[in-house]
Amino acid sequence: MKKPLILSFLFSLTACTAVPPKNSDNICATFREKEDWYNDAKDSFEKWGVPIHVQMAIMHQESHFVADAQPPRTWLLGFIPWFRPSSAYGYAQAKDETWDDYLDSAGSWSADRDDFADATDFIGWYCNISHNRLGVSKSDAANLYLAYHEGHGGFHHKSFLKKPWLQQVAIKVAKRSTLFQHQLGTCEKELQSESWFFW
């Protein structure tokens, strides 16, 4: 009797684990598969003014929609697992100190980095600050990503100019944002009607 109980318990744990969308390159497919995600991203847009396609492009780059994503560990002497290079965690890859700032100013005490709704709200919050402090348009995915990656101080001092690789990543994020915008234009009415139906 013990073995079936253990297997049942393990299955229940697996079922509770957030699985990334099967087709993360198609925002319509992603929102159809993850039924609550469209409304979560829309809530963030209505709260912070950062377009859904921009939020999702940044999240795609940061975690590929993996709930518990973390930077890979470094290796000591080539074979001993060592520390991770940063405390970044979750869908938005928010670092500990930045997440704490978010909780203090905008989030709720129960917000989690591995919760999609909280993560997309965090991205909206951070990009809204980038807009207010740095004058970056909320539709400018490339520069919003540079500010997201480098921090507001780093972006202000143009630290990204010394990182050609990062500039290429920002261009990639901008292209994905444009792709997501076009894709969303073909399915958003459907998503809106479905969300109204299940409200």
Residue ranges and their predicted role:
Residues V19-L191, S195-F198:
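Catalytic glycan-binding domains that act on GlcNAc-containing polysaccharides
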Residues P4-L13:
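Sec-dependent N-terminal signal peptides
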